[in-house]
Amino acid sequence: MSAAAYMDFVAAQCLVSISNRAAVPEHGGAPDAERLRLPEREVTKEHGDPGDTWKDYCTLVTIAKSLLDLNKYRPIQTPSVCSDSLESPDEDMGSDSDVTTESGSSPSHSPEERQDPGSAPSPLSLLHPGVAAKGKHASEKRHKCPYSGCGKVYGKSSHLKAHYRVHTGERPFPCTWPDCLKKFSRSDELTRHYRTHTGEKQFRCPLCEKRFMRSDHLTKHARRHTEFHPSMIKRSKKALANPL
């Protein structure tokens, strides 16, 4: 029983007791019941001291009044939330096929085919919120490779196109250096290759004067410095992107 319900119960008992004292008939009834009558001047000594009876009566009235006053300030209870009304964390973020997988068994879906926001959450998302949260991040990758047996999924369509060329063998980026016949499936691969012809080394170590053609080579070198911090590489990249 809650505290508020208990207060109601005690107040009701007090009021019932007061009512019983006022309703006891003057004639007949058990001697014990007669003692519950309201104090009157006719009360005899065998029924006890009238002053004590009156004090009892006043005490009951005071308690009942206090409890009723307390009920005025009873806190409003907020409605409890049932698990059935909870929304799935990954609601409207796409179906299970959006999750990166190596099996490739589930078909891909377009954004128009995503789960209806008004549909009920799955039992798995309610029982295991951590799994649902993981699915939310994975479902952000909606571009799945359509090649048979490949289950890779990408967040950008351009990344999917570049990956798909691995299956088709297409290399649309030829090197323009004289007498070089190499072709590449990705533009960044061509850019790195082209620096081998020009000798350009645009990635400079922030802790020494060495330069490198590739950013990964710079990172590998910079880690050898004891005072190196990854933020140094990020600052140097921003400086290259914004020379002014």
UniProtKB/Swiss-Prot annotation:
Region Disordered: start-end pairs: 24-51, 80-142
Record GO terms (molecular function): DNA-binding transcription factor activity, RNA polymerase II-specific; RNA polymerase II cis-regulatory region sequence-specific DNA binding; zinc ion binding
Residues that bear Phosphoserine: S122
InterPro entries tied to this protein: Znf_C2H2_sf (IPR036236), Znf_C2H2_type (IPR013087)
Key words of the record: Biological rhythms, DNA-binding, Metal-binding, Nucleus, Phosphoprotein, Repeat, Transcription, Transcription regulation, Zinc, Zinc-finger
Amino acid composition bias (Basic and acidic residues), ranges on this chain: 32-51
GO cellular component: nucleus
Database matches in PROSITE patterns: ZINC_FINGER_C2H2_1, ZINC_FINGER_C2H2_2
Biological function: Transcription factor that binds to GC box promoter elements. Selectively activates mRNA synthesis from genes containing tandem repeats of GC boxes but represses genes with a single GC box. Acts as an epidermal circadian transcription factor regulating keratinocyte proliferation.
Protein family membership: Belongs to the Sp1 C2H2-type zinc-finger protein family.
Name used for this protein in its record: Krueppel-like factor 9
Species of provenance: Sus scrofa (Pig)
Lineage: Eukaryota, Metazoa, Chordata, Craniata, Vertebrata
Gene: KLF9
